[in-house]
Amino acid sequence: MSARTPLPTVNERDTENHTSVDGYTETHIPPAKSSSRQNLPRCRNSITSATDEQPHIGNYRLQKTIGKGNFAKVKLARHVLTGREVAVKIIDKTQLNPTSLQKLFREVRIMKILNHPNIVKLFEVIETEKTLYLVMEYASGGEVFDYLVAHGRMKEKEARAKFRQIVSAVQYCHQKCIVHRDLKAENLLLDADMNIKIADFGFSNEFTVGNKLDTFCGSPPYAAPELFQGKKYDGPEVDVWSLGVILYTLVSGSLPFDGQNLKELRERVLRGKYRIPFYMSTDCENLLKKLLVLNPIKRGSLEQIMKDRWMNVGHEEEELKPYSEPELDLSDAKRIDIMVTMGFARDEINDALVSQKYDEVMATYILLGRKPPEFEGGESLSSGSLCQRSRPSSDLNNSTLQSPAHLKVQRSISANQKQRRFSDHAGPSIPPAVSYTKRPQANSVESEQKEEWGKDTARRLGSTTVGSKSEVTASPLVGPDRKKSTASPSNNVYSGGSMARRNTYVCERSTDRYAALQNGRDSSLTEMSASSMSSAGSTVASAGPSARPRHQKSMSTSGHPIKVTLPTIKDGSEAYRPGAAQRVPAASPSAHSISASTPDRTRFPRGSSSRSTFHGEQLRERRSAAYNGPPASPSHETGAFAHARRGTSTGIISKITSKFVRRDPSEGEASGRADTARGSSGDPKERDKDEGKEAKPRSLRFTWSMKTTSSMDPNDMLREIRKVLDANTCDYEQKERFLLFCVHGDARQDSLVQWEMEVCKLPRLSLNGVRFKRISGTSIAFKNIASKIANELKL
């Protein structure tokens, strides 16, 4: 993979009738078919009858749905041979037209040739006649976007650590002649160690010097001025502009360019004027002036940006340099020996690795080089469906590799630095104490498609982060001090606003694009319909009353691999945020209005995990759905986020919310709230007795979503939470011993908010905390009710 394989360049005009697939949207270079052995084998050892019922795809036991759309769904899965967690994206090829399939496979092909520690990585491709399965790593840190929503702007030291990784990864793509074209906060993921992973290569393409690209794609607030002008471009320069917007966003928590509609946004981008916050350093301001340059010819190259003073503050002896891709370790004797015990032949292993087949053999080899999943709360590795029976706590101690100097950052949550302890190909030593399951000889096929390809919308499928191939020390983590700072006006942006998700879209032809972007045609953008898979609200409110508006997610027309988190409440109602909290993917029941000062502001329809691609001619045919922006008030800065979040109102989250929705009496149903789980779950005191005192709260490593902490007994905390919920007329259902699913508001008035409250253990602080996690509803409505409840809790 170190030698770049030339990619066929897809004609930029060849994209009409494009239909996006959750994050995979551009070209047909068929991936290697999976071997016959890949027909869904099972792990023989340590499988109980319960786990036996779980569906399989290849060597992966599917567990939870973490994203779903019209043509694809994403499942959290576990590799039965190694026990590693992965994300499996299941795409129904029969629903895609030839152009969409071509783009889908181009994205897969591009992902195969990228090998950088800060870019998501593909593990395995399994293709059948009707379905494509993409196996990727699942990341637990969530999006940078969600991080900003929850915590506000980053301090420059923290932003620098992240931005160095972003620049390194993008420059690596450019040196391989690949342009991303959809760089934004939503497409930047964080792994368990808070390292950046760039995701969603659905709009990426190969570029060649002298040949211009002409597709206008990406999210408008991050789009370069030449795109708004309908000009052709080389490629890298549009990514450089987007990086400038990202840097501004990291440091300020708001966008440098924004508008109430596309016309206003276009005018501001073409002016190139943006507000410099008082707290921004001069060095950072100077770097922005190199990135956000109107003339693309004068815009700095990433090689020049790497040498910038701000980029290297604190790294004077390890100036950021272009990433040198290491030689792949294709002959790790320990991993190969383990695979032989699983039933793989040595010749088969060698052939798969040398040919880079991305089949079950290569995937197993790569996964063996990655650190095993960490189990909290004393969970045993032999439980559930794991085939890896035991794992010494020190099994990876000797596998730490030195991270590239330009990617080294320190972890702020503790005094000692913790390095990433694994590498995909320069694999760690595998301790002999770890035993793995033999590969079965007989292959059974279990179709996992019991669920229909739902039209239930999920929150954007995010992108699964994929393993780094060289070691990187952890980026700064969030500690308790960070939580406090989010409530501080000094570290929060302007009040009343909200950082909104932005739609990524495509105009293929310059004539169509030009028409769509003219002053008199700003309404053409409003004719875009909502994406086929709209996402549910997923932002996390700050830890307390904040004077800063929150980031509203940019919705892209191309989908993401997936965002990772832990399992969710139910199949079909999960999400991927850190802390194992579960999100319910579904259409948001509310149209989100952030500020009373902009009641009649039109809004971009909430996009989806797989973002629909829009073309110039399609713009004229689709109904109005205006681009949302902040009020055009002189008191608002150009970069302030004041966008409304809007979800499709076609349905409330099925399976869960039906019991909470207020019904209109005229529909023949009982008015008021339907029976709540609170009523059906029985007396809380009786339930406490029934479940016994042995149950313990789940342990969390981080305090990101903690509204409050206490030394009180968890059962007493749970009773206090119920008391406050009752006092605020909130409905709730006890999903687990210390987990409540809560609902407040009226769906008919678009004020319905759904969230989780969980009592968790914080072992590092020797305290218990209350974790809040929004599932649906506007970020402002959630923040209001969550803050009210948190303030009333007497813990």
UniProtKB/Swiss-Prot annotation:
Entry's Gene Ontology molecular function annotations: ATP binding; magnesium ion binding; phosphatidic acid binding; phosphatidylinositol-4,5-bisphosphate binding; phosphatidylserine binding; protein serine kinase activity; protein serine/threonine kinase activity; tau-protein kinase activity
Pfam families: KA1, Pkinase, UBA
UniProt similarity note: Belongs to the protein kinase superfamily. CAMK Ser/Thr protein kinase family. SNF1 subfamily.
Cofactor dependency: Mg(2+)
Stretch list, region Disordered: 1-41, 377-498, 518-699
Compartments, record wording: Cell membrane; Cytoplasm, Cytoskeleton; Cytoplasm; Cell projection, Dendrite
Domain text: The UBA domain does not seem to bind ubiquitin and ubiquitin-like and might play a role in regulating the enzyme conformation and localization. Activation of the kinase activity following phosphorylation at Thr-208 is accompanied by a conformational change that alters the orientation of the UBA domain with respect to the catalytic domain. The KA1 domain mediates binding to phospholipids and targeting to membranes. Binds phosphatidic acid (PA), phosphatidylserine (PtdSer) and phosphatidylinositol 4,5-bisphosphate (PtdIns(4,5)P2).
Descriptive protein name: Serine/threonine-protein kinase MARK1
Reaction(s) this enzyme catalyzes, per UniProt: L-seryl-[protein] + ATP = O-phospho-L-seryl-[protein] + ADP + H(+); L-threonyl-[protein] + ATP = O-phospho-L-threonyl-[protein] + ADP + H(+); L-seryl-[tau protein] + ATP = O-phospho-L-seryl-[tau protein] + ADP + H(+); L-threonyl-[tau protein] + ATP = O-phospho-L-threonyl-[tau protein] + ADP + H(+)
Domain Protein kinase, chain residue ranges per copy: 60-311
Encoding gene, per UniProt annotation: Mark1
